[in-house]
Amino acid sequence: MALPVVYGGPGRYVQGPGELSRQGRYLSWLGDSAYVLFDQGTKDRLFKQIVDGFQDDNLREPFFKIYNGPCTEAAVVEMAKEAQAEYCDMVVGIGGGKMLDIAKAVAHFAELPLCVCPTAASMDGPCSAISVLYHEDGSFDRYLMLEKNPDLVVVDTDVVAAAPLRMTVAGMGDALATYFEARSCVAARGTNEHGGTPGHLALVAAHACYDTLMECGVAAKRDLKKGRMSPAVERLIECNILLSGVGFESGGLALAHAIANGLTILPECGAMHGEAVAFGLVVQLRLERAPELAEVLEFCQ
């Protein structure tokens, strides 16, 4: 029997400048008492905006949790128990990819609604129903498949644009693979990350990633270098986080991500996730003898 077409995505996605300080208006949809996760670096840079974001009459004082360790199953289960013990009714994760994976897993094990606030456009995980778990030594453990996508994703483009340029460029590498991996899944009659068949909407979102990168990627990088917000930067952030997130999850993954995950066991690798995915994509396209290989190589350089 043929598998059904299955799509997934966040309950609501909000993107714009200054939204971290205004997230309370959205969080009140989920509950009134938040278990808020971030690391020390995020606290040092953004604590005022974080606190301002909870100045809403419908919210109680949040429980702030600073965590700097790896996203291991033992750690997230312990934090889930803490969230329940503090009578929190939602989880909020603020930070980069690792912190958002932690927040997703905590919400999963605590069975609570989830809001994620990415502080960089370094990967396409914020919108997904997947949390990547690692061993204590930082090597890849497994994908934790969640029951649902985040209920709310809040992207403050002022914060994301201020992140180190390398992080945004790494996110471009992650998004670059989205279309080609989805295309491979369709060609092989494979399944997507929801266990269903990739449908037309998934391919449209995935192809939009590639088109956006080719149209706006270079200009957005140039603007970010100059510290300038622009329509190209806004489109790139949406591409890296939303389009690629929906595209990879509903379209499926292939060799590019398999290679990237394998590289995590090599301590000398030192690459960010999106950088490793871009390398894996080049290998995938070479093996497929894909006509886009030259264009992809030129873009990566």
Residue ranges and their predicted role:
Residues 193-301:
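Active-site segments that bind and position negatively charged phosphate/pyrophosphate groups
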Residues 1-90:
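ATP/NTP phosphate-donor binding region
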Residues 11, 108-201:
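A glycine/threonine-rich phosphate-anchoring loop and its flanking beta-alpha core
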